[in-house]
Amino acid sequence: MATVIRPVISEKNKYWIDKHRHYELKHFCLQYPVWKKIYAEFSDASVSLSMIERVPTSNIPGDPTAKRALMRTYYGERIKLLEKVALEADLYLHKYILKAVTEGLSYTYLKTRLGIPCGKDMYYDRYRRFFWLLSQARD
């Protein structure tokens, strides 16, 4: 069973955020693989109009090209936000952090399967820093 990091840490911790805010951000991150898939589909010029019509876009004009561009921008901004914040959290561990927060992976998995080059304490410090930075970026 995977280690589950507790969303509640001491309010004295430099990266403290509210428990419910942590859950909100965690679930925001877990949407990343879906965003990547949809972004790739909207980047493909051969995507049929039926794909565009499936996405709820009630406030977007009827022009399919405009819809495609707006949806690429929408998903692209979210993808870039997570990648930028992971890079800010740690220059060397950003790939591991991004993989962990977007796929729900534990430190144990990162260490045994992916060979993360740091200890548990350092990793979880950067993990908390990631969510703290993301919270600031999303405000």
Please place each PLM-identified region on the residue numbering.
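Helix-turn-helix DNA-binding module
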Residues: 103-120
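N-terminal interaction/assembly modules
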Residues: 1-88, 108
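DNA major-groove recognition helices of helix-turn-helix
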Residues: 123-137
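Short amphipathic alpha helix immediately N-terminal
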Residues: 88-105
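Short amphipathic alpha-helical surface patches that mediate protein-protein
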Residues: 98-102, 115, 128
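Short acidic alpha-helix initiation/capping motifs at coil-to-helix transition points
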Residues: 73-76, 101-103, 123
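Long, hydrophobic, amphipathic alpha-helical segments used as structural scaffolds
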Residues: 43, 90-93, 134, 138
